[in-house]
């Protein structure tokens, strides 16, 4: 994917990010949101993560944003400060082209450089084999499943949990 470039997201990317996410919310099961957020809400979410120095990356192809990934807090309790949760979304035409793997690999590297020790993937829908596969390809291992905890598009959905150590992981205190 030599023609794909990765960079830190900016406010100028919010319209494209909003479109990508809206498609995932409306037609997919990767997100358990039922209504797509508007640009103002997506900008608020992006700003909140960037203000806390979490990595937020976009993939560009031919000058257009075709995917994005970010890390955010896993839970809002201090003992979790060394753990992040990843999110990864691609434009529909960008699936199965290696862009997700590029984004996730970069997200792992940036999160590790920031000193985080664990990354968690909370994958909506156990049938989302593409997301499970890309996470496995980047070193995540299956931790478990929550069964039938979401209801969307007329069916019950599982959530798959995957985890990857960053840096020394739990080999030493932070």
Predicted regions: what is each one?
Residues 4, 64-68, 157:
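Glycine-rich phosphate/pyrophosphate-binding loop shared by adenosine-nucleotide-utilizing enzymes
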Residues 5-17:
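A short beta-loop-alpha structural element at the N-terminal edge
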Residues 18-46:
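Conserved GNAT-fold acetyl-CoA-binding loop/helix
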Residues 36-93, 104-105, 110, 165-167:
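Acetyl-CoA-dependent GNAT
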Residues 70-73, 122-123, 132, 136, ...:
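Conserved catalytic-core motifs of GNAT/GCN5-like acyltransferases
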Residues 96-111, 133-137:
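Conserved acetyl-CoA-binding loop-helix of GNAT-fold acetyltransferases
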Residues 111-123:
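Conserved GNAT acetyl-CoA-binding A-motif
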Residues 148-174:
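C-terminal "cap" of GNAT-fold acetyltransferases
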């Amino acid at each position: 994917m030599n023609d794909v470039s990765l960079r830190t997201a900016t406010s100028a990317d919010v319209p494209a990010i909003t479109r990508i996410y809206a498609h995932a919310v409306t037609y997919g099961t990767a997100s358990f949101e039922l209504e797509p957020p508007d640009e103002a809400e997506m900008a608020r979410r992006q700003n909140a993560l960037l203000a806390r120095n979490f990595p937020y990356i976009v993939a560009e192809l031919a000058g257009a944003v075709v995917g994005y990934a970010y890390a955010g807090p896993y839970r809002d309790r201090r003992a979790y400060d060394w753990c992040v949760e990843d999110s990864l979304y691609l434009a529909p035409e960008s699936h199965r082209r290696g862009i997700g793997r590029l984004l996730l690999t970069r997200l792992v590297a940036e999160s590790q450089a920031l000193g985080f020790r664990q990354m968690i993937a909370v994958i909506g829908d156990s049938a989302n084999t593409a997301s499970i596969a890309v996470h496995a390809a980047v070193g995540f291992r299956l931790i478990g499943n929550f069964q039938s905890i979401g209801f969307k598009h007329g069916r019950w959905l599982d959530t798959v949990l995957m985890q990857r150590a960053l840096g020394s992981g739990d080999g030493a205190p932070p």
